[in-house]
Swiss-Prot record:
Active site: K10, D141
HAMAP family, sorted: IspE
Enzyme Commission no: 2.7.1.148
Encoding gene (name): ispE
Function comment: Catalyzes the phosphorylation of the position 2 hydroxy group of 4-diphosphocytidyl-2C-methyl-D-erythritol.
UniProt protein name: 4-diphosphocytidyl-2-C-methyl-D-erythritol kinase
Organism: Klebsiella pneumoniae subsp. pneumoniae (strain ATCC 700721 / MGH 78578)
Length: 283
C-alpha cells in the first residue's frame, strides 16, 4: 500500500550562538517552529527486505542520502532489539520542494519522516525517545522533527523544551544560493559568546539571528533579499541561511508582498504551526 507522508520545513525564529565546545560544535539557543509547507515522501512497504530510493539525488550516492541512512539506521536498531518484522523493506520517493542549503531543515526533516513513518508502517514499536536518539546520529536538527512540536533548543540543538509561540504567517524567500552550514560556523567573525538567557527572557525580547550578519556579508544575494523584505515587515535569516523570512499577521498580507517580489527572488507563503504536519498525520 502506497502512503504519503509530510516532511515539513522549520524556521529558526531566533538563533543565538552561546559558545563552542572542545569538539568544535557550537552551543546555541534557538526557537524552532514548523511550517505547513514542505517536501512529501511516498513510501510503499515491501516484504522482501529491500530498500529502494526511487528518486535519487544527482551527485549523492544513495547510501549517503539522509533518507536511506535513516531507513538503514531504523532497520539496524529495530533488528538489534528483535523488533523488525521479517522482510521489512520499502520503496521511497520524494517530491522535493525545500531547497538544499536553505536553512529550512529539509534533509533533517526527510530523515525524521523516514524514521517516524517506517517505525509506524513496519510496526517496530520504537518510542519517540528512541527515534529521537537515532535521529541525533543523523543530525542535530533531526530530533525536533521526530518529536514534532515547536521547541526551544539548547546544547547543539538537541536539548528541547516544548513551547507555544504565536502561529503567524510567513513569507519565506530563497535568494538562489545554497549556504553549507560549515561556511557560517567556521567564519572567524561569527559571534560565539552571546549570553545564555532563560526561555521567558528570550521569548519577550526582539528576535534575531547571530548568523545573519555573516550570511549577509558573504552572500550578497542574502543581503539583497533581506533588504527587500525589510521594507515590508520584520524579517530575519533562518538557520545559517540562505532562506530569509518575513512575518505577517494574515495570509493575505504575506501574499500581497510576495506578489511584488523581484524576478530573481523565489518565495512561498506558509503558516507557522506548533504541531508539525508529520505529527498531525499520526493523530
Amino acid at each position: 500500500m502506497m502512503t504519503r507522508w509530510p516532511s515539513p520545513a522549520k524556521l529558526n525564529l531566533f538563533l543565538y550562538i552561546t559558545g563552542q565546545r572542545a569538539d568544535g560544535y557550537h552551543t546555541l539557543q534557538t526557537l524552532f517552529q514548523f511550517l505547513d509547507y514542505g517536501d512529501t515522501l511516498t513510501i510503499e512497504p515491501r516484504t522482501d527486505g529491500q530498500l529502494r530510493l526511487l528518486t535519487p539525488v544527482a551527485g549523492v550516492p544513495d547510501e549517503e542520502n539522509l533518507i536511506v541512512r535513516a531507513a538503514r539506521l531504523l532497520m539496524h536498531a529495530a533488528s538489534e532489539s528483535d523488533r523488525l518484522p521479517a522482510g521489512s523493506g520499502a520503496d521511497i520517493s520524494i517530491d522535493k520542494r525545500l531547497p538544499m542549503g536553505g536553512g529550512l531543515g529539509g534533509g533533517s526533516s526527510n530523515a525524521a519522516t523516514v524514521l517516524v513513518a517506517l517505525n509506524h508502517l513496519w510496526g517496530c514499536g520504537l518510542s519517540e525517545d528512541e527515534l529521537a536518539t537515532l535521529g541525533l546520529q543523523l543530525g542535530a536538527d533531526v530530533p525536533v522533527f521526530v518529536r514534532g512540536h515547536a521547541a526551544f533548543a539548547e546544547g547543539v540543538g538537541e536539548i528541547l523544551t516544548p513551547v507555544e509561540p504565536e502561529e503567524k504567517w510567513y513569507l519565506v524567500a530563497h535568494p538562489g544560493v545554497s549556504i553549507p552550514t560549515p561556511i557560517i560556523f567556521r567564519d572567524p567573525e561569527l559571534p560565539r559568546n552571546t549570553p545564555r538567557r532563560s526561555i521567558n527572557t528570550l521569548l519577550n525580547c526582539e528576535f534575531s539571528n547571530d548568523c545573519e550578519l555573516i550570511a549577509r556579508k558573504r552572500f550578497r544575494e542574502v543581503d539583497a533579499a533581506l533588504s527587500w523584505l525589510l521594507e515590508y515587515a520584520p524579517s530575519r535569516l533562518t538557520g545559517t541561511g540562505a532562506c530569509v523570512f518575513a512575518e505577517f499577521n494574515t495570509e493575505s498580507a504575506a501574499r500581497q508582498v510576495l506578489d511584488t517580489a523581484p524576478a530573481w527572488l523565489n518565495g512561498f507563503v506558509a503558516r507557522g504551526v506548533n504541531l508539525s504536519p508529520l505529527k498531525q498525520a499520526l493523530l
